[in-house]
Amino acid sequence: WASFLIKTPSQKIYMAGDGGYDSHFEEIGKRFPDIDLAILENGQYNEGWSLIHLMPSDMAKAAKDLKAKKIMTVHHSKYALAKHPWNEPLTNEKKMQEQDSLNMMIPEIGEVMPL
């Protein structure tokens, strides 16, 4: 669903966009090693939408496949499109950060995040 990589002289930033988990994350990680920041969606997921939105269990897998140094999550805490509680993605992210030892940036709505 239209992911892209921004490469500057000092950083590589990968923006996943909407999309489910598959082998493309591993392929991107191999093709573009040393990704500094991966921006991954987390929210508005549903088993029926797993091809167009990352499921919580797949976000950590995608992050590890990309081998990104840091992860920032987006696509959460706005309005309820899916049936999960609006704050469930943030709760899941904090658990993943601890369980999977991910270096995550978890911005609140409107928070400025230096890259």
Model-found features: residue ranges?
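A short acidic, often aromatic-flanked loop/helix-cap motif at beta-alpha or helix-coil junctions
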Residues: 110-115
